[in-house]
């Protein structure tokens, strides 16, 4: 098992095929704004469907507050495309993630089910505009994951700290 990421560490670079063509480069795709990276178990997971649906619903508010979102899983391109269409996902979604690469680079939990094969457990990161981790949520099973309202509140809190530090630094 590799080590999990701590607050303040840079999210390691990941490159995944993206729905719609091209590649999803993380954290680069989110650099310059606060970012959310959602690793979901798969299109078949009801908890993942709920989480993604919540981020889709909150996407206008997240965008207004300068928060970008990206998601990925080990699902094949075809089922990921159907998943994106089903939820009308407006943010970048990667597919066909390599379990070993993701486990080694960011420390996500993995699981193998006879009916589902090998996949990544739900993992979420809130990133600062420079790509460093502000918050990491590692789940070892289906529950325990980022929710949009917490992300919005955390970013507001971080912005408040930054404003306070700036005010205290002024002569």
Model feature map: region roles:
Residues 1-171:
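Chalcogenol-based redox active-site neighborhoods
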């Amino acid at each position: 098992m590799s080590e999990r990421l701590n607050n303040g560490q840079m999210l390691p670079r990941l490159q995944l095929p993206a729905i719609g063509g091209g590649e999803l480069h993380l954290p680069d795709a989110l650099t310059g704004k606060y970012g959310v990276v959602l690793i979901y178990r798969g299109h078949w997971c009801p908890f993942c469907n709920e989480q993604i649906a919540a981020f889709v619903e909150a996407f206008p508010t997240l965008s207004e507050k300068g928060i970008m979102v990206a998601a990925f899983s080990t699902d094949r391109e075809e089922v990921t495309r159907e998943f994106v269409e089903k939820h009308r996902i407006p943010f970048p979604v990667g597919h066909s993630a390599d379990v070993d690469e993701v486990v080694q680079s960011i420390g996500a939990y993995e699981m193998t089910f006879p009916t589902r094969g090998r996949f990544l457990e739900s993992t979420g990161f809130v990133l600062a505009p420079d790509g460093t981790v502000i918050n990491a949520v590692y789940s070892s099973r289906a529950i325990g994951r980022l929710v949009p309202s917490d992300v919005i509140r955390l970013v507001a809190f971080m912005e408040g700290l930054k404003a306070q530090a700036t005010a205290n630094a002024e002569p």
